[in-house]
Amino acid sequence: MKISVMAATDTGRVRDHNEDDYVALGGKESPPGVDALLVVADGMGGHAAGEVASKMTVDGIVQSLNDQREESSKLEGNALGAFLGKVLEEVNQEVWQAAQEDDKRGMGTTCTLAAIRGDQMFLAHIGDSRAYLLRDGELHQVSKDHSWVEDAVDQGVITREEARTHPNRNVITRAIGLDQQPQIDTSVMPLADGDLLLLCSDGLNSMIPDEDIHRILTSSDPEDVCQALIDAANDQGGHDNTTVVVATVGARRKAPAATQPSASDQDTQEMTITSPWWKRVVRAILRRR
């Protein structure tokens, strides 16, 4: 299946520098053994250390996949998913070691990685940068936030609505660089023709709800979606850096008739996005296997 990828990032309207980093590689640009590689890393730490952590992470992932091309190309299914988790563990060691330096102490980064091979997506994830799948017109969050508020919602301490404005909403419970032995979530799921995949930093979903993300995705031309999402986050205050990385699988999603792209636009790339309950979605997807 043909994979089209695109991405955009923005500092926002409050921060003076961008601590996000990303990878959006498809086709001949993708690392050996995969058809596309998508990564979003949202760095944290003072004195620009967050930028260092996110850049070390995305660069380390690409370098590791290139260095271990023979091993990764032979792996399939859960074995490839586990391999990607191992890659993040190795990158974590490098970031953790660098974070022991005085000027980088406390730095870290979220990391959400999606590798596509054939009709499967392999996800490795730590932190609260999200992965969303749009399938058959329905938007699903397929990653779980590693955050204080997510744990509180799971325990029934607060509601999902209260989590959006809770004082601890920016507190994450896992990240690259914080521990020598990070707990990384990995999963494998099948992809279908027409699927859309979105990875984003929390600068997007903390500013606009999933309903608005869905509306933008379904009412914008594909080549405009990344910028439209960032503009929407900035219009709501742009309190954080915002990064979106998008991939489409197979047939292009058509824009609404009123905004149909011209023939000259038909070679541009496209995108994916968001939704609520990750557990329900993963179970539903796995039942199709």
Stretches found by the model and what they are:
Residues 1-289:
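PP2C/PPM-type serine/threonine phosphatase catalytic domain
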